[in-house]
Amino acid sequence: MKRHHHSVFPRAPRTAPCRACASAVAIASLLGLPRVALADDALPSKSTTDAAPAGAAGSAKLAGSGGAAQALPAISVGAARAAADAGNLSKPAGTGSRLGLSSLDTPASVETLDGERIRERGDTSVLDAVTRAAGFAANAAPGNGGTSVSVRGFSGPESITTLYDGTRMLVGAGTVTFPVDTWSVERIEVLRGPASVLYGEGGLGGVINVVPKAPRRERETSLLVGAGSYGQKRVALDTTGALGPMLSYRFHVNDDRQNGWVPRGESHLSSVGGALKLDVNPSLSFTLDYDFARQKPMAYFGVPVIDGVLDPAMARQNYNVGDASIAYYDRWARLNTTWRAAPGITVRNQFYGMLTDRHWRDSESYALQGDGSVLRSDYIEIRHHERQVGDRLDTTFDGHLLGRQNRLVVGAEFNDVSFVDTSNTPFDGQSVVPAFGFDPGSFSSPDATVPVFRTHTRQAGVFAEDRIELSDRLSWISGLRYDYIDYQRDTFATPSSPASSFSKTFAHTSWRTGLVFSLTPDISLYGQYTTGTDGVGSLITLSKSSSAFNLSTGDQWEAGFKQAFAGGRGAWTLAFYQIVKRNLLSVDPQNPGQTIQVGKQSSRGVEWTGAFRLGHGISIDANAAFLRARYDDFNESVDGASVSRAGKVPINIPQQTANLWLDWAFAPGWRAGAGLRYVGRSYGDTANTVPLASYTLLDASASWRATKDLTLSLYLHNLTNRVYVETSQNSGSEWLLGAPRSGGVTATLKF
C-alpha cells in the first residue's frame, strides 16, 4: 500500500520521448489517421458527446473526439431501445470494449456514472463517486496517491487500472495521483473484472475510466462558488462554445481548499484544463486537450491501535510532524484525431504525453507504547518524477463475414516511460510524543535525500476485437492483445552500496471470448471467459529482488443478466463471477528465507445493480455486491518460520458493499436526495487477526433553482458522524479513519 517500500516499489528516470512514437504520430496526422470513435462512442473517451442509443433504428452515431456525428451501420440487436435509459444500459460502454457497444450488447459488467448526478450528490472527488458503483470500496492513503480502491477481491493501482479519457499513465511505486476531482467530468465508466485484453498489463480486478467534458458548439458557462465545514472554500468555472464554423472550445478551472478535520490537516486542490476541437469536415476532426492539477492533500497517515482496538479519544489526532508536506503535480496533454476514411472504415489516433512530480516529507508510522506515548518512525522524504509519451492507433471495419454483420477493431499502442526516484532511504529517524497535547515537532532525518534510481520502460502492444452476429439474437465477441515490455533500472551509488543496473523483458498475451443472447431488445444474457496479467509490483519501478519473477496471471469466468423495462424508466443487472490469480510471490515453506512464485488467490461473487425512475420526480439507484476472496496458496515468514495464509481474506478487502440513493424532485425547481453507503468487514493483516468493522454512511443533498440561471445547493456527508476505518497499514496497527460529519453550500450560475 505504501509507495516508499523501496525493495518492492521503486521510482525512476526522466528520459527523452520515444522518437519512433513521435514520428508515427506525425505520419498518422499527415495521413489523417486518427482516434476512432464509433457507433455509440466505441472508445472510452470523451469523443461521445451526443451518442445515440445502441439500438437506434438501423443506424448509430460516429462521434470523433467530440466531432460531428455521422451515420454508421448499427451494431445492436433488435428494435430501438427507449431513450429514457435509467441504468444507462443502452448508452455507450466504451470502457468495456472498443467496439462501440452498449452495455446490453457487451459480455461484461460495466457501469456508467453520469457527471451531473455525481455533482448533484456532492461527490467532489473521483474516489467518492466511484465508490458508489457496485463492489467498489475506498482503500486510499497518501502513500498510494489517495486514489486506491478495491473491487472483486483485488485492490491497489496495479490491480485496478485508472484511465483518463481512455488512456492510462503506467503505475510507478504503487501511486496514482490523477484524475481526482469531478468538476470537469462528463461521466465515469467502470469495468469489473480483468481488462488486460483492452489496456495491457494490470487491471485484474477492474478499470475506472474518467471521461472529461468535451467541447460543444452551443455556448454555455457555469460558475460555482461554495463554502463548507472545516474552513472549506471553493470556486470553479466551466465554459464551452464555438470559435467559428470549424472550431469549438472548452475551458475549466477549479480551486478547493480547507483546513481539515484533524490538526494540521490543511489541503488544497487546484486544477485547470481545456480543449480545442477542429472539425475539418464531416469525416475528419482533431481535438487537442491539456489538463493540469496541483494537489496538497491532508498530511494524515492515521492513528495507532493495539490488537485492533481504537481509543476513541485518539480518533481526531494527527501524529505527523508539524512541517509535513505532500504535493502532487500532474500534467496531461492529448491530441485526438478521428477520420472516417470510407464507408464502414473509421480510424482513430491518440498521441499523448503525461508528466507527474510528487513529493512526500513526513513521518508515516506510529506505534503505541506501554506508557501511552506514541513512537513515530519512518521519517520519509521521497520525490517521484515520471514522464510518459505514447500513441494509440486503431481502425474499425464494419461489414459482413460469412453473410453475418461483423465489426472488427485492430490497433497498436506504444509507450515510453521514464521514472526517477529520489529519497532518504533507509528512512531512519524516530521520535516519541505524548498521545495528546503534544508539540508535533519538525522533520529530521539522519539520511540525506539523494537520487536513488532511475528506470526506463518501453511498452508496445497490438490488439484486436471482433463482434459477429451469429443470429438475429446471438452475438459472439472476442478479443486478443499481445504486449512486449522492455525495462531497465539503474541504481545510483551510495555510501553503503555501489552503483548497479539490470534489465528485464516481459511478453504476455491476453484474450477473452463471450456470447450475448438477446431475449428481447431490452433483455440480454451473457457469458464470458477472460485472461489477464498483473505485475508482482509496480512494473515501471520493479526492484532487483523482484526481477527474477514473471508477471502474475489470472482468468475470470462471468455470466450475467441485463434488463431495461418500463420504456427505459427501470433497469437492473445481475453478474456472477470467479477470478483466479496465480504466480503470487510466496515464502518457500522449506526455506522461509527464500521467495518463490507459486502463490494463488481467488475470489467469487455476485453483483446486482438497479435504477428506477418511479414518476412524480422520484428516482432510486441501488447496488449490492457479495464476494468470497481468499488466499488459496500463500505463505509468509513470521519470526523466521513459514506460515500458511491459505483460506485467509486478503488485506483491506470488504466482503460486502451496498449503495442506495433516493432523489425526489418534490416541487418545481426543488430537489432533495439521500443516500446510504455500506462497506462490510475487512481485515488489516494477512493472518486476519485485526478485523476492521463494517460501516454505513448517510449522505444527503438538496437544491433550489432560484432563477433560470441560479441554483443553490446544500450537501451533507456522514450525517451520523460515524467513526470508521477507510483503510489500514502496517499489518493493521495503523488505521486511517474516514472524514467525520461535514456539510457545504454552493451557488451555481449558468449562462
Task: Cite the ranges covered by each PLM segment.
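Periplasmic plug
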Residues: T112-G115, E120, L127-R132, V149-P194
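Outer-membrane beta-barrel translocator/receptor signature
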Residues: V171, W183-E186, V197-G274, V280-L284, ...
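Acidic/polar loop-and-plug regions of large Gram-negative outer-membrane beta-barrel proteins
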Residues: D256, G260, G273-R340, Q350-E386, ...
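Structural signature of Gram-negative outer-membrane beta-barrels, strongest in the C-terminal barrel
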Residues: D279-N281, E386, Q405-R407, E413-N415, ...
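Surface-exposed extracellular loop regions of Gram-negative outer-membrane beta-barrel proteins
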Residues: R294-V309, S418-V420, D486, V516-E558, ...
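Membrane-embedded beta-barrel scaffold of Gram-negative outer-membrane proteins
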Residues: N336-R340, I345-E364, S524-Y526, L551-N635, ...
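Gram-negative outer-membrane beta-barrel transporters
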Residues: Q578, Q597-T686, T720, K750
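C-terminal beta-signal and adjacent terminal beta-strands/loops
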Residues: Y678-D685, S703-F751
